[in-house]
Curated annotation (Swiss-Prot):
Signal peptide bounds: 1-22
Glycosylation sites: 52
Principal EC category: transferase
The name this protein goes by in its record: UDP-glucuronosyltransferase 3A1
Pfam families reported in the protein's UniProt record: UDPGT
CC per GO annotation: UDP-N-acetylglucosamine transferase complex
Described function: UDP-glucuronosyltransferases catalyze phase II biotransformation reactions in which lipophilic substrates are conjugated with glucuronic acid to increase water solubility and enhance excretion. They are of major importance in the conjugation and subsequent elimination of potentially toxic xenobiotics and endogenous compounds.
Subcellular location: Membrane
Transmembrane segments: 484-504
Organism of derivation: Bos taurus (Bovine)
Recorded family membership: Belongs to the UDP-glycosyltransferase family.
This protein's encoding gene: UGT3A1
Alphabetical UniProt keywords: Glycoprotein, Glycosyltransferase, Membrane, Signal, Transferase, Transmembrane, Transmembrane helix
Length: 523
């Protein structure tokens, strides 16, 4: 078995070894937090495999407090957003987070964020010095991340082939995948792949709601496109999505629901996972105090360094106090309210080595916001979860965690000390959750190629072949009515109705002839 895997691996990476000439690759990172971390990892992996990688990095709004920038060997091309725009975005984002913690966040608030990102894109494309420098580099390939649409417009402006990274689960954006509505849940339908009749009715209706929201998000970039692209060559954002040579998706079927994929779609969930290192001594000393009871890791993501609702904070702190385990909580100590006494079994830290703590033998539970990178790391190490979704794709992610039976979730507005403590004890004490998490880990780990090998292998493949036209279906060139055979149905309907009309006419003629013949006979 090991020999077969080695042979498969060698056969897959051989073309990359033969492709000895290093390619010039541009990666575009315009959003912070986990989005930057994923693009950093992709850039570093490709650099380590012999390519010359440059990252276009928007400084000022992404290296969040507490993030320790790792050493990197790829080049960085920095650009700075005007300070007033940066401050406006920070105010809007803080307002968005306050509404999230207050349970008042709506799609319109997210749309406001996307509109600001559209304005930021205009500022970038307006920077002739930046765009000229990038054009002069003559990159072979651009790698863009699908959180907002600006990276796609940058690649289009440079006139270079591009590869897209989807940082979330499948289905969060439509880039042409077949999606049978009978078992592929629409994003934000909060359905699984096992739908009853009413579930399928809901999924069908949510399909139209999903496309309406996608259209609104894409419309936020209309002014940017009109300003920076001439009338005769203005890109349509939905068409740009299908123009990508490859789509790398930050998911894995150990987590996601099985569904059809296209040949140019590659799952790389787990790309952020790294070999486990010993945790720093301060963490080890804290963990040791709780012996075999172990510890619980709490992190609500790279974009949440503190909780803006004191009520939620009190309830979470009280819930942790009910546990016999120690609790290591990623929370900025300088923001801890003075009137709330920290539970004696809780350690709060501004930064923590999440991957190493998840790989620690004494970890018992991971309390997470449900971000994809965090979930993939938890699956890698077989750690069960309690999820507290905040916004974006996190509700859908944690629905999948629950469906796969290696965790549960609780809504932010439902958090009470007793309820949260009960959920955590349930997952820690019921060994079925741990078993399901370990089963998912085996599925993730036992695949023939690692996520990094898939990434590098497919990038090298399209560099060798000059693109991925051979991996894209002709459907991308067809109008929508051809894809759904509406012209065929219309033709068959016309033929059927025409035939019925003609048959009716003929029957009428025959009936009149027979009636006429009877009258003549009687006469």
């Amino acid at each position: 078995m090991a020999g077969q895997q080695a042979l498969l691996l060698f056969g897959f990476i051989l073309p990359g070894l033969l492709f000895s000439e290093a390619a010039k690759i541009l990666t575009v990172s315009l959003v912070g937090g986990s989005h930057f971390l994923l693009m950093h990892q992709i850039s570093q992996i490709l650099q380590d495999h012999g390519h010359n990688v440059t990252m276009l990095l928007q400084k000022g709004n992404l290296l969040l407090p507490g993030f320790k920038e790792e050493e990197k060997s790829y080049k960085v091309f920095n650009w700075f957003l005007p300070e007033d725009c940066n401050e406006e975005f920070k105010r809007s984002f803080h307002s968005f987070m306050e509404k999230t913690f207050g349970g008042r966040c709506k799609f319109e608030h997210f749309l406001n964020i996307m509109e600001l990102l559209g304005h930021h894109c205009s500022h970038l494309l307006r920077r002739k010095d930046v765009m000229k420098s990038l054009k002069n580099e003559n990159f072979d390939l651009v790698i863009v991340e699908m959180f907002d649409y600006c990276p796609f417009l940058v690649a289009e402006k440079l006139g270079k082939p591009f590869v897209a990274i989807l940082p979330s689960a499948l289905g969060t954006v439509d880039f042409g995948l077949p999606s049978p509505l009978s078992y592929v849940p629409v994003f934000y339908s909060l359905l699984t792949d096992q739908m009853d009749f009413w579930g399928r009715v809901k999924n069908f209706l949510m399909f139209f709601e999903f496309f309406k929201k996608q259209w609104k998000i894409q419309s936020a970039y209309d002014d940017t496109i009109k300003e920076h692209f001439p009338d005769d060559s203005r890109p349509v954002l939905s068409h740009l999505l299908t123009k990508a040579e490859l789509w790398f998706v930050n998911t894995d079927f150990a987590f996601d629901f099985a569904r059809p994929l296209l040949p140019n779609t590659v799952c790389i969930g787990g790309l952020m996972s790294k070999p486990v290192k010993p945790v720093p001594q301060e963490f080890e000393n804290f963990i040791t105090k709780f012996g075999d009871s172990g510890f619980v890791l709490v992190s609500l993501g790279s974009m949440v360094s503190f909780i803006r609702s004191q009520e939620v904070l009190k309830e979470m702190n009280a819930a942790f106090a009910h546990l016999p385990q120690g609790v290591i909580w990623k929370y900025n100590p300088s923001h801890w309210p003075k009137d709330i006494k920290l539970a004696p079994n809780v350690k709060i830290v501004h930064w923590l080595p999440q991957n190493d703590l998840l790989g620690h033998p004494r970890i018992r539970l991971f309390v997470s916001h449900g971000g994809m990178n965090s979930i993939m790391e938890a699956i890698q190490h077989g750690v069960p979860m309690v999820g507290i979704p905040l916004f974006g794709d996190q509700h859908e992610n944690l629905l999948r965690v629950k469906a796969k039976k290696f965790g549960v979730s609780i809504q932010l507005k439902q958090i009470k000390a007793e309820t949260l403590a009960l959920k955590m004890k349930q997952v820690i004490e019921d060994k079925r959750y741990k078993s399901a998490a370990e089963a998912a880990s085996i599925i993730r780990r036992s695949q023939p190629l690692t996520p990094a090998q898939r990434l590098v292998g497919w990038i090298n493949h399209i560099l060798q072949t000059g693109g991925a036209a051979h991996l894209k279906p002709h459907a991308f060139q067809q109008p929508w009515y051809e894809q759904y055979l509406l012209d065929v149905f219309l033709f068959l309907l016309v033929v059927t109705l025409g035939t019925m009309w003609l048959c009716g006419k003929l029957l009428g003629l025959v009936a009149r002839w027979l009636c006429g013949a009877r009258k003549l006979k009687k006469a």
